[in-house]
């Protein structure tokens, strides 16, 4: 049966990658279809009810700067907001929000249902329509054939998903949802490298059976940070605290005594789990000297009693889970509402992708999210937006776009994945970026909103607010440069009280603000110096740009040097055995990874500077020197 309409972009999957992919393509004015096995689970948080964190918050801000929906959704569905690393430099400060799981999902669904150019259809995808070697649409579980110029796969953990609780296991995409078996089998027939990964989740607990009074309360920040550049704290719903408790020796003893019943330690689970979100079994084994591990007790929402005990993800049998939970202070009488579990699933080697998320061997097919070996809502959302954008560009026969490593954490992530691949679930950290000072949360809009506007991702409302902010920043920076404080200034005494070294000569406000002990707010509070900008985001931008100007300029110089050969293209069909002077090891690694540029090749483990020089000579000799735009 043929569907009655053809689409520019078909997105398979309605999780965090799928919703961003579909809305990105739709914002570009393209006829877009979001195919989901269940409309009621659009934007569902399968694991912890939170958005953001170190590195992750940066990704959310970048998605927002490009017009994405995640930041706006969490502003409307977040029940606790905090800035992490607030005492550290601006490069590593990160926003995190606790979410009301149901409210967040409802907000996402409402956004999608009202999105122009976007249609939603509830059907599982079982097959791809091929036109020669390229994708031309999908086939649903009921045999409906839907034609599309491009297809984006954002299927999460559903491909051959296998859920484990103790020695028992059953097929599932996540708890309560069926797996995608037919599509997984179809994809295994294609020339793609495939492997297995695993992730897990803790048991959920009824708050009415818990004694929160013996735990440490953890409140949000005041004033509250806002995720979206066009958001406002007044949009936030009622705020609630989280709580902190700990495992203890009794907990650890229960786990050690039952490791033989763990599917991970019994060899039943083959997939590798996330390094930075290990199960409680892993923690006890890998950190045997630790007598306690933190558990963050997170409310699931404002209208439910369920709690999420972040830190005790487990796949041990249910009876052991009960013992583990009840050994913890405050949980002695806890009632588990849902058992914890581990899930194994198929993923595809992201080295088979171009940096724009398109398959190297199957034109018009794009991958985003956990199918690429990543973990986390934020990583999925960022990939989804990039895949949806490039699927839209491909549908219009326009050039692809992806950010460089110095432009965005999205660029860092996709370069890591497409160049190096991953053997374990990939998670974003600020430490993965070599140009952290350029890739701050606060300047994500400065870096990306202009580009997003050119690509058709940024609407008039966002563009107007962005330009108004930029005008404020530029005018204030000009005022700071041209306003001088001299030794006879009437407010000299107040200025000297602010600085470590009293003024002996005339200094501009900009020079004063460069001093480490001076803040913008304190300087503006001095009579005759202000007023401060009413927009705190613009004021923060002024302060950061002035205080860190030297460091920022130095990083820009480093980027300029690095870019000289970074964008030199390498032909995808190049046989490195034809390049004289390369070692067999280098040839094997280059033929395996098939890097798109000299920059990507240089970041492959074992590729030496000498090998890069040989490649450049070969390209020049054969007239192959080309650079990306």
Curated annotation (Swiss-Prot):
InterPro entries: FAD/NAD-bd_sf, GIDA_C_N, MnmG, MnmG-rel, MnmG-rel_CS, MnmG_C, MnmG_C_subdom, MnmG_C_subdom_sf
Residue pairs linked by disulfide bridges in the UniProt entry: none
Superkingdom of this protein's organism: Bacteria
Cofactor(s) essential for the protein: FAD
Keyword Cell cycle: no
Binding site for FAD: 13-18
SUPFAM superfamilies: FAD/NAD(P)-binding domain (SSF51905)
GO molecular function annotation: flavin adenine dinucleotide binding
Job description of the protein: NAD-binding protein involved in the addition of a carboxymethylaminomethyl (cmnm) group at the wobble position (U34) of certain tRNAs, forming tRNA-cmnm(5)s(2)U34.
Protein name (record): tRNA uridine 5-carboxymethylaminomethyl modification enzyme MnmG
Organism: Aeromonas hydrophila subsp. hydrophila (strain ATCC 7966 / DSM 30187 / BCRC 13018 / CCUG 14551 / JCM 1027 / KCTC 2358 / NCIMB 9240 / NCTC 8049)
Taxonomic placement: Bacteria, Pseudomonadati, Pseudomonadota, Gammaproteobacteria, Aeromonadales
Gene: mnmG
